[in-house]
Design a protein with these regions (language model features):
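Short, surface-exposed beta-strand/strand-loop-strand elements in extracellular ectodomains
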Residues: 89-101
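Terminal (often C-terminal
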Residues: 15-89, 110-113, 151-172
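Beta-strand-rich receptor-binding modules of extracellular spikes/adhesins
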Residues: 1-18
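Short, surface-exposed tryptophan/glycine-enriched loops
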Residues: 118-140
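Short beta-strand/loop motifs in extracellular/secreted proteins, especially
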Residues: 91-93, 139, 162
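A short, structured loop/turn motif at beta-sheet edges
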Residues: 70-72, 99-104, 132-140
Length: 172
């Protein structure tokens, strides 16, 4: 028997939940910033997308580049970084999604690399992962870059040059 809980709106089939709460949120970096070499967290200039986007469900929170989840569940996380290289070729340009399940130790949970063959090049790198959030107080994510030399992480308040997108795809 299919029922809908009057208090929560949860759809049940013989007492088993068959529909999970929906959530989609998207954030971007609004101002470009040059980053030094090595692995560097993207900690500044984050804002929620406000161009042709509508938040679905609950919203993520961000503090110094660390994103906290409002509810438990399984999340698809997609990230992209647009780099501008202005000092020669780069052997690698990395977009890394890091996660923690203890609010302390971060590990790579998604990542991808590209390279730049010259000066004054724009390069887009994207990464994605699935993250099982079982505790909203301890599970968090952040976006990091990795490259030799310097490069500028491109920002924009009009569209998503450097951005992170969260979609809740199911219950944990």
């Amino acid at each position: 028997m299919i029922t809908i809980d009057g208090g929560t709106g949860v759809i049940l089939n013989n007492g088993v939940e068959i529909s999970s709460e929906k959530m989609v949120d998207e954030w971007r970096v609004h101002t470009s910033k040059e980053h030094g070499s090595g692995v560097v967290a993207v900690t500044e200039y984050w804002e929620r997308n406000d161009n042709n986007f509508a938040l679905i469900g609950k919203s993520m929170t961000e503090s110094s580049g660390v994103f906290s989840f409002p509810i438990t569940g399984i999340f698809l996380i997609r990230a992209q970084i647009n780099f501008y290289t202005n000092g020669g070729a780069r052997a690698y340009l990395g977009c890394i999604i890091e996660g923690t399940s203890d609010n302390s130790t971060y590990v790579d949970i998604g990542g991808n690399y590209a390279s730049s063959s010259g000066t004054n090049y724009y390069n887009g790198v994207s990464a994605q992962c699935v993250f099982d959030v079982t505790d909203t107080s301890t599970h968090k994510v952040r976006l990091k870059t990795n490259f030799p030399g310097t490069a500028t992480v491109q920002g924009s308040s009009n569209y998503q040059r450097t951005a992170i997108h969260f979609t809740r795809i199911g219950n944990t």
